[in-house]
Amino acid sequence: MVAGHFTYGARWATRQERRIAQNPHWVFAASWWQRDARHSVRLSDQFADGDLADFEPIGLREAPRIDVRRASLRGRAPKPPVRRPPNIILIVLESVAARWTSLSGGGYNTTPTLRAEASRGIVFDNFYAHIGRSSNSLSAMLLSAYPKLGFRDMTAEYPDLPGTSIASVLRERGYHTGFITPSALTWAGWDRFLDRRGFDDVRDERQLACGERISSWGVEDRCMVDDMVRWMEADAARPFFLMTWTQQTHHPYEPSPGIPLLPLARDRVIDDFGFDRYLNVLHETDHQIGRVFDAVRRAGRERDTLVVVTGDHGQAFGYPHESFMQGRTIYEEDVRVPLMIWFPRAYRVPMRSAVVGSHVDLAPTIVDLAGVPPAPEWQGRSLFDTRRSPRAYFYVAEDEFMLGVREDGWKYILNVRDGTEELFDLRTDETEQKNLARLHPDICARLRRRLAAWTEANRRQYLQARPAGAAHLMLRAPGA
């Protein structure tokens, strides 16, 4: 108990009390705003009409298509395949930041399977979640639509949000579609949100028949993979799209029974808010994902299958910033997520890309590789689109309300409450330690206008979809 007080309590729980003591009025207002769920943030900065182009529907701007094998890493879209449309497997890793995987340069041996399979694919090093909240990531990935700039879960606030899902697009092309997770889809209204989204089959822990829960979040990821393999083998006549979502890497990071813990935390304190447990669970999930690749090869579908692995958001463990869990900041450990695309048909040698992208770009990228046109209302762009924006947008709406944008190597963060600005050059400062805002006011002003355009585009986007009787609240940063 004493150890728990000094490791868990002192490092995290008391930190929440300190926030409340330092900002009581803001915390009270934020809690009211979160409970009300009807307001949207806006900035009053002036911006050019052209700044809204980042958020326009994809139907207003078509991209050329060329062979991906001759494309530069800056990204161009492949032409549609002439053979059977590829099977598509999308695996979303719960609470996994790029930093903690073996795909990044962090040195953690957590995902040896993904590292090995990347030899027949491409890894995107600068891919982002829009917020550290799973429900909002689901909405963005599935519908290629920016989530509302607010506090609430998109699945609960907008269960019937208009939009065309990637599953619907592919089902119209003859794909058999499915969604499988070892969690309970009743959480935050996911079951209702996924209803009528183009999935032939939707399965959660209740259909997996895998015994007792391993934690309050659901059964083991192993159970999901068992069901994935059965599902993929059930209908070989049609191409399929299977979206899956793991759960064991969610707090409390419960390891599978009988799996010994490995010393994966390196020089970090073993009981560093569950960091070592987290890394071990990620290692076990990676092992289970290896069974998916084995099943694809066993079925002889290696050249006819596209596997996409990404994360829903990051997870923080107190380094390099004083932040824990997720959704509290928009530093790299919170919002930069892995993205590996395994496609032996196109990639015979490992490739890496520095293209900046985000969750809204995932669906357009997948259908692009499959040779299928995107839904015209999608806001994202294929990561192989030569005319795509070099920017990614993200926000946090918990203890603070912060907006952020990554543009090439620059990352800009604005605290809407107090006007604090942070500017980092990620090309030389990967851990965001040197705030260059005072040295580059011109860059800050330009990127702040980009954020102002985002808030306006987001307001227009959700104007008709807002809950009945909604009003919006303008937050003006000091000096705005």
Regions found by a protein language model. Give the residues of each.
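His/Cys-centered metal/cofactor-coordination and adjacent catalytic loops
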Residues: 72-79, 83-86, 97-176
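C-terminal cap/loop subdomain of S1 sulfatases and analogous C-terminal strand-loop tails that border
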Residues: 316-317, 361, 367-426
